[in-house]
Amino acid sequence: MASGPHPTSTAAAAAAAAASASSAAPSAGGSSSGTTTTTTTTTGGILIGDRLYSEVSLTIDHSLIPEERLSPTPSMQDGLDLPSETDLRILGCELIQAAGILLRLPQVAMATGQVLFHRFFYSKSFVKHSFEIVAMACINLASKIEEAPRRIRDVINVFHHLRQLRGKRTPSPLILDQNYINTKNQVIKAERRVLKELGFCVHVKHPHKIIVMYLQVLECERNQTLVQTAWNYMNDSLRTNVFVRFQPETIACACIYLAARALQIPLPTRPHWFLLFGTTEEEIQEICIETLRLYTRKKPNYELLEKEVEKRKVALQEAKLKAKGLNLDGTPALSTLGGFSPASKPSSPREVKAEEKSPVSINVKTVKKEPEDRQQASKSPYNGVRKDSKRSRTSRSASRSRSRTRSRSRSHSPRRHYNNRRSRSGTYSSRSRSRSRSHSESPRRHHNHGSPHLKAKHTREDLKSSNRHGHKRKKSRSRSQSKTRDHSDVTKKHRHERGHHRDRRERSRSFERSHKGKHHGGSRSGHGRHRR
């Protein structure tokens, strides 16, 4: 629709615009938006801004679909073939006609509903929109346009009754449940959608009155059979798309032409009578062929059409999900990057070859072989460095266990202010126990290295050096390190070697008593420091 600024300043300006537009003649014709505008500019027009306007005329008599929108239609773009779409159009128009009769609507309202139905599905697809819901919306909207409104409840009840008759079931009233409420909301939304898609241009110019007027010009209005037959052809042509392709005057001439040929009533041919009404013979023949083709088609099968539409709908949904990278259930699909998708491989072997080994069994074997490799590495003569490191680790753990046993013996003693002899005897006993434990913790292969006298000497020196450090440091180191490393192993070994350790304990106690006098001063000084 073309429009321009409308002068509203003064009445004189409006009069000048009307005077300047007297030489302009509006053009008749249709456009895709349903409006026709004619604008003529003269030298005596009205200047508004930088433009000169003479007249703006708006007509909404009729709207036609342009040729480029007739094929392919939105339904054909969604995968629906042309015969199925034609059957759906015919079935929808038949539903509107039958519902209009049951609703006692005038024929003009039923014709308006069918034209709106055709217009809507030239902009939308049958796959995405239910034709039955759209048919309800179109007849409800047409009843309002033709000033014969009906309630939505009545429209839904009539379509429910027609559905039962089509399925050859016993008619039963519609239950007012949630399904009814959902259907009602769908009809209301579909009506709004029709208005939006048509740009609120829902005016339809019907050829009913034009047929009567043309027959009066031809002096055939008294022939009721001719009038009724032409009227019937016009109602049948509403199921085709001729009402969105041709002007109503051309359709009226084609209906009169068909009725006269069927009843063998002669009409003027020199010149042809339809030239008087501005119609060509090619257009009349095209409308007649399209209308007569309607009678050669089989009755559309509702169930097959529903299955076809549902099939196309599922295919469309699959294509959309595939474009988004999703499966049918909404879960994300596996990516084909890296060749991990089974679809990328032409064929996968069903049986695993004997030469190929499972990675799980290889991992298990490597785990089992690890301790054997460690034992072989410790026994080999080339790993002397590892043996020395192991010895140093065992000596460190022995010293830490000594400090731990000593701290435990002190913490467990109930009295700290005993005389020096009792404290010394307690420390010596704890030392002997720690020595025996440390010797039992060390591996058996290290027992032949050194005499017990040298080991006792080393342990006393380690004890003196450990006494010089802080008491808090001993506790933290002994608790954090000795517990985690070898406490579990020590408890297991003590359970199996109790008899052997008892003999060693007696030997260490006798050795202790013999050397008691030599180290009497050092131990006293150490205990004195701790008491301070």
Swiss-Prot record:
Region (Cyclin-like 2): 209-293
Ranges of compositional bias, category Basic residues: 388-424, 444-458, 466-482, 492-504, 515-532
Gene3D superfamilies, per database record: Cyclin-like
UniProt region (Disordered), positions on chain: 332-532
UniProt region (Cyclin-like 1), positions on chain: 94-196
Pfam families: Cyclin_C, Cyclin_N
Chain intervals for the UniProt region annotation (RS): 396-438
Cross-link (Glycyl lysine isopeptide (Lys-Gly) (interchain with G-Cter in SUMO2)): K345, K353, K368
Compositionally biased tracts (Basic and acidic residues): 348-358, 367-376, 505-514
GO function terms (MF aspect): cyclin-dependent protein serine/threonine kinase regulator activity
Entry comment describing in which tissues the protein is expressed: Widely expressed (at protein level).
Superkingdom, natural source: Eukaryota
Key words, A-Z: Cyclin, Cytoplasm, Isopeptide bond, Nucleus, Phosphoprotein, Repeat, Transcription, Transcription regulation, Ubl conjugation
Annotated Gene Ontology cellular component terms: cyclin-dependent protein kinase holoenzyme complex; cytoplasm; nuclear speck; nucleus; transcription elongation factor complex
Sites bearing Phosphoserine, chain numbering: S341, S344, S358, S361, S380, S451
GO biological process: regulation of apoptotic process; regulation of cell cycle; regulation of centrosome cycle; regulation of RNA splicing; regulation of transcription by RNA polymerase II
Classification via InterPro entries: Cyclin-like_dom, Cyclin-like_sf, Cyclin/Ssn8, Cyclin_C-dom, Cyclin_N
Residue numbers bearing the Phosphothreonine modification: T331
Complex and partners: Interacts with POLR2A via its hyperphosphorylated C-terminal domain (CTD). Interacts with CDK11A, CDK11B, CDK12 and CDK13. May form a ternary complex with CDK11B and casein kinase II (CKII). Interacts with pre-mRNA-splicing factors, including at least SRSF1, SRSF2 and SRSF7/SLU7.
Annotated domain remarks: Contains a RS region (arginine-serine dipeptide repeat) within the C-terminal domain which is the hallmark of the SR family of splicing factors. This region probably plays a role in protein-protein interactions.
Family: Belongs to the cyclin family. Cyclin L subfamily.
Described purpose of this protein according to its UniProt entry: Involved in pre-mRNA splicing. Functions in association with cyclin-dependent kinases (CDKs). May play a role in the regulation of RNA polymerase II (pol II). Inhibited by the CDK-specific inhibitor CDKN1A/p21.
Stated name of the protein: Cyclin-L1
Gene transcribed to yield this protein: Ccnl1
